[in-house]
Amino acid sequence: MKKTGTFICVCFALLAAFPVFFLAAGSLMGAGELKELLQPILTGGEGFASWKMFPRYPTLRSYVELLLDSPEFFVMFWNSVKLTGGILAGQILVGVPAAWGFARFSFPGKKLLFIIYIALMMMPFQVMMLSNYLVLDRLGLLDTLTGIILPAVFSTFPVFIMYRFFEGIPEALMEAARLDGAGEFMLFIRVGLPLGSPGIISAMVLGFLEYWNLIEQPMAFLKTKSLWPLSLFLPNISLEKAGLAFAASVVVLLPAVLVFLAGQDYLEQGIISTAIKE
């Protein structure tokens, strides 16, 4: 029974990994081979496109073209770095103290406010898009990276993740620190941050995976092409440059994979923590 379960899990894992193999194989194919395989798509003719998991004649030409002949790629890569880094830094500055306040202090309307936080967390961007657009327009932040970063900084999702970890800190430990003369700020710095670091890291990993691939907000709020992130670079590659699209997809995927692998253990702790009923 155990072997059967393992076999099924391996099959599903391979199925989930197939798109990655698909991208990697396509990025190593030459223009002629891609044109041959994707002929019905490129020409709009009848029939079905075919595919091979291994290129006939592997080549790095697509990567050379991307990294040496596509300067706009590096501009958009840097835009993605600035967007993601700015959002995550802002969420740490705003979200960590907010989560600590929810977890360690009692105040009137706390439960109602937390319910509002959860409701906001569940709302998709499409619901908030018009109001965000109008506010950013009044503030003069449309068509700026700040206009993308600022609303995301105040996302309630990282607060929800970190709140669970801060709430789990034993009260006896807090009392012992108070007896040693620690004030509320030092409790936060010396006790809260070290013990809540798994929650902070898991929130940052999830945030990176979301904001690295951000597409709806840039499409709605950015008009200048030089401000676009990588998520808008890929859809604008023509079908005739399929190899370039595959290579760009692999390069864009790598940071997300590396961050996920580095923070996987913390991410699992965050998922388990948020699944525990209060």
Where are these regions (language model features)?
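A structural signal for multi-pass alpha-helical bundles of membrane permease subunits
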Residues: G5-E278
